[in-house]
Design a protein with these regions (language model features):
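Short, hydrophobic alpha-helix immediately C-terminal to the catalytic nucleophile
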Residues: 5, 112-113
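A residue-level signal for conserved active-site and pocket-lining positions in enzyme catalytic cores
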Residues: 18, 165, 214
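Glycine-rich phosphate/ribose-binding loops and adjacent secondary-structure elements
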Residues: 89, 96-97
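Small-residue hinge/turn detector
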Residues: 107-108, 130
């Protein structure tokens, strides 16, 4: 299993690098459009959207200008999707997949992303350590977040890791199921506890609670399924 985890981690890093470069290339293309529109953001957005239809006075020149960038972006997208497909296939080979596939809203790529960032979940002595790794811990009575100075080391916060859980949480809420129900129940509790809070505040607190519960259950399932796997191997031996 260690080899599978190592492969997933490497594919995840490649995927992240490709995705970052994709986004940077898109931003560069948009920057070119803004320059051609003398900094007019509204007009630049129209030009950007017209790069295919050429339905803009400057579209022909702009499209020719950024074509190499767009080609590079397409190559990056293809390679990123290859990494995602390979990582997802490997994630299905992990013993814990038998548990994860029953969780609505969490697919093989989501599992691969968590493992890509956290590694072997069996190395975490408790769920709290995993929460911190994925940006969901409580540090000195406050939620883990991006801070500066000496506190940054203690928080150990990574926006990328937190983003993974944020996206997974969104997917779960949309797909329904046990964890979506848990989110809705917790949201009602938050509304009662903090009647002066905003809807966004209640939503975020309930979603964070649900994401932490998911990680805690994933950690427990990892321990259980890997123990079963080891015992099966002993019997077969």
């Amino acid at each position: 299993m260690n080899e599978i985890i190592s492969e997933i981690k490497e594919l995840h890093r490649k995927r992240v690098d490709f995705h970052r470069t994709e986004k940077a290339t898109t931003l560069r293309i948009k920057a070119v459009c803004r320059r051609l529109c003398d900094g007019d953001k509204t007009e630049a957005e129209k030009l950007y959207k017209a790069l295919d239809s050429l339905n803009h006075p400057q579209a022909l020149y702009a499209a020719d200008y950024v074509e190499p960038m767009r080609q590079a972006k397409n190559v990056l997208e293809v390679e990123r999707k290859k990494c995602e497909k390979q990582a997802g296939k490997l994630a299905k080979q992990l013993p814990v997949w038998s548990w994860v596939e029953g969780v609505r809203g969490v697919g093989p790529l989501a599992l691969a992303q968590i493992i890509g960032e956290a590694g072997d979940l069996g190395n975490y002595p408790n769920p709290a350590k995993l929460w911190k790794r994925m940006g969901l811990a409580v540090i000195n009575g406050e939620r883990q977040r991006k801070v500066s100075g000496a506190a940054a080391l203690e928080h150990g916060y990574s926006p990328e890791r937190r983003s993974i859980m944020f996206v997974i949480g969104d997917s779960i809420i949309k797909c329904g199921g046990y964890y979506a129900d848990l989110y809705r129940a917790r949201k009602q509790i938050e509304e009662t506890k903090l009647p002066e809070g905003t809807k966004a505040h209640h939503h975020n607190r309930a979603k964070r609670y649900m994401e932490k519960k998911l990680l805690r259950d994933l950690w427990a399932a990892w321990k259980a399924t890997n123990k079963e796997n080891v015992e099966t191997e002993k019997v077969e031996a």
